[in-house]
Amino acid sequence: MAGHLKLVGVPLKVRRLHTAVCHYRGRTGAEHLWLTRHLKDPFVKAAKVESYRCRSAFKLLEMNEKHQILRPGLRVLDCGAAPGAWSQVAVQRVNATGADSSSPVGFVLGVDLLHIFPLAGATFLCPADVTDPRTFQKILELLPSRRADVILSDMAPNATGIRDLDHDKLISLCLTLVDMAVDILHPGGTLLCKTWAGSKSHLLQKRLTQEFQSTRVVKPEASRKESSEVYLLATQYRGGKGTRRP
């Protein structure tokens, strides 16, 4: 699968809010309710003020503040990176642009099925399916020394509306990342992935416990309270000494 390397910085503009307002008319009651909540969301407003591409940036900012996931000099693989908000945070925290001359310079690689607008300090591989073996090989080629210190994932499958099916798909995506870690994640590294609470959550947690020394469930304030979304933070990767899926 062909990917596109994006290195040039462009002004960061939040377009979603403007687009939503322009198309407010002609929506259903449920859509009006969602849009009203969206426009009142303090994290949406803060993202616009601080030039983050979407509100999810504040999830990573909070988790990083509490758990020190990112630091200057680290190599980061951001899976499900579009529209690029997590990559923005990662670029800042690992000093990927070299803005701080007194600190090590890190690296950020973002991968997504969707197009991502260029961001200074980040390399984007898109459109690309992280589960495709060809994408995997391209990731290895792009990562410095073919390794990442941190794997971030805010990925989610296209929703079917069938909760159990969507949950199963997301768990499968997360397990794919754990499988990839054997060849990508540096020993001692970190994996942070989004999941939805459900019947198979324990399978993912069990696998992470086998592969990492420490695993915890995190629910940042920016995650909506009514959402089943949680993040699994696994640290101190054992280096593939756990049990790989058949």
UniProtKB/Swiss-Prot annotation:
The keyword Transcription regulation does not apply. One of its GO terms (cellular component) is mitochondrial matrix. Keywords: Methyltransferase, Mitochondrion, rRNA processing, S-adenosyl-L-methionine, Transferase, Transit peptide. GO terms for biological process: mitochondrial large ribosomal subunit assembly; rRNA methylation; rRNA processing. It catalyses: uridine(1369) in 16S rRNA + S-adenosyl-L-methionine = 2'-O-methyluridine(1369) in 16S rRNA + S-adenosyl-L-homocysteine + H(+). It is found in: Mitochondrion. It holds the Pfam family FtsJ. The keyword Ribonucleoprotein does not apply. GO terms for molecular function: rRNA (uridine-2'-O-)-methyltransferase activity. Its EC number is 2.1.1.-. Gene3D superfamilies: Vaccinia Virus protein VP39. Residues 1-24 form a transit peptide. The active site is at 194 (proton acceptor). S-adenosyl-L-methionine binds at residues 83-86, 112, 129-130, 154. Belongs to the class I-like SAM-binding methyltransferase superfamily. RNA methyltransferase RlmE family. S-adenosyl-L-methionine-dependent 2'-O-ribose methyltransferase that catalyzes the formation of 2'-O-methyluridine at position 1369 (Um1369) in the 16S mitochondrial large subunit ribosomal RNA (mtLSU rRNA), a universally conserved modification in the peptidyl transferase domain of the mtLSU rRNA. This activity may require prior 2'-O-methylguanosine modification at position 1370 (Gm1370) by MRM3. Essential for late-stage assembly of mtLSU required for efficient translation of mitochondrial DNA encoded proteins; methyltransferase activity is not required for this function. PANTHER family: RIBOSOMAL RNA METHYLTRANSFERASE, RRNA METHYLTRANSFERASE 2, MITOCHONDRIAL. This is rRNA methyltransferase 2, mitochondrial. It comes from Mus musculus. The gene is Mrm2.
